[in-house]
């Protein structure tokens, strides 16, 4: 494993569990109706809804006769997405993460949910995945590509392991789309890098970048959407709860003092999203037959 990727693995090994008060076993953003007032009571439902909305947007059928037979979650975290999809669709799900601690947690979680025979997790590099070409009917990633240096290679690997006709789903934090010749303002670039540093991410790109990297590959029906308004309702809740005694101690006890950087990053994320310099991009396509 390259040194850069080892640092990502180390980060996740140290902060795994720090945010489970808000996300449970789903280390990704939730989906809210714009203008919703997020509460702790609905935050778990929102992360589940995000999975459903992404699959729906990508055209993944729930019809038993047309449903996928297998799914790969790239950057599978604590295993929440794989376990949920395996149960909902009654299919085989595989997760890959660079964090050994997350693999162990995910395996234990799958066992407690009774789907250990339908779900498996591998510790590996998303830039060089240990899977054969055309293996999976759905290839899914959310809030992962931000942590990868070579994002174009990441996408090529996703497409490589996707079966003909497979849905390919990419969802991530992103910067705004830019016109030809346009670049991020130095101030905005600095703010986004501070967010990345606090969240253990490497860099952000735009949804146009994802589309540009997918276009020369054997992928059709490429479409993109901006779901920023659907994730921002959570930010006020995160800022409020993270500074309660319960929230603060949960984050520090489970994630260590390094997790404090995540709290600071939340402040920046909320403001950047409000100012329009941070987006939540969704891009999907279908592997050509």
Curated annotation (Swiss-Prot):
GO terms for cellular component: peroxisome; thylakoid. It is an enzyme of class 2 (transferase). Mainly expressed in young leaves, and, to a lower extent, in mature leaves, flowers, stems and roots (at protein level). Induction: Up-regulated upon methyl jasmonate treatment. Residues 134-142 are annotated as: SAM motif II. Residues 71-80 are annotated as: SAM motif I. Its EC number is 2.1.1.99. Pathway: Alkaloid biosynthesis; vindoline biosynthesis. It is found in: Thylakoid; Peroxisome. Inhibited by gamma-tocopherol. Its main location: other. InterPro entries: Erg6_SMT_methyltransf, Methyltransf_11, MTs_g-TMT, SAM-dependent_MTases_sf. One of its GO terms (biological process) is alkaloid metabolic process. A motif (Microbody targeting signal) lies at residues 287-289. Belongs to the class I-like SAM-binding methyltransferase superfamily. gTMT family. S-adenosyl-L-methionine-dependent N-methyltransferase that catalyzes a nitrogen methylation involved in vindoline biosynthesis. Displays a strict requirement for a 2,3-dihydro bond in the aspidosperma skeleton. Can use 2,3-dihydrotabersonine, 2,3-dihydro-3-hydroxytabersonine and 2,3,6,7-tetraydro-3-hydroxytabersonine as substrates, but not tabersonine, vincadifformine, 21-hydroxycyclolochnericine, tryptamine, norharmane, harmaline, catharanthine, norajmaline, ajmaline, serpentine, ajmalicine, yohimbine or gamma-tocopherol. Inactive with picrinine as substrate. Homodimer. This is 3-hydroxy-16-methoxy-2,3-dihydrotabersonine N-methyltransferase. It comes from Catharanthus roseus (Madagascar periwinkle).
């Amino acid at each position: 494993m390259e040194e850069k990727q080892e640092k990502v693995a180390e980060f996740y090994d140290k902060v795994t569990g720090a945010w489970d008060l808000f996300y449970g076993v789903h280390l990704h953003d939730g989906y809210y109706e714009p203008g919703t007032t997020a509460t702790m009571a609905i935050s778990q439902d929102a992360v589940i809804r995000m999975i459903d909305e992404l699959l729906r947007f990508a055209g993944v059928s729930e019809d038993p006769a047309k449903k996928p037979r297998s799914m790969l979650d790239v950057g599978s975290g604590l295993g929440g997405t794989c376990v949920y999809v395996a149960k909902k669709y009654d299919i085989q799900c595989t997760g890959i993460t660079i964090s050994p601690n997350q693999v162990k947690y995910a395996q234990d979680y799958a066992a407690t949910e009774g789907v250990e025979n339908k779900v498996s997790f591998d510790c590996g590099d998303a830039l060089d995945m240990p899977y054969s070409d055309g293996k999976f009917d759905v290839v899914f990633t959310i809030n992962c590509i931000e942590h990868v240096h070579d994002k174009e290679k990441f996408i090529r690997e996703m497409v490589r392991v996707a079966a003909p006709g497979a849905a390919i789903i990419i969802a991530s934090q992103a910067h705004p789309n830019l016109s030809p010749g346009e670049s991020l303002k130095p101030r905005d670039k600095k703010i986004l890098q501070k967010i990345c540093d606090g969240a253990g991410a490497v860099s952000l790109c735009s949804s146009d970048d994802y589309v540009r990297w997918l276009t020369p590959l054997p992928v059709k029906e490429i479409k993109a959407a901006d779901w920023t308004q659907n994730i921002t309702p959570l930010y006020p809740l995160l800022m409020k709860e993270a500074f309660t005694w319960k929230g603060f101690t949960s984050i520090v006890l489970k994630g260590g003092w390094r997790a404090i950087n995540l709290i600071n990053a939340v402040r920046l994320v909320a403001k950047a999203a409000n100012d329009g310099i941070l987006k939540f991009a969704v891009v999907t396509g279908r592997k050509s037959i």
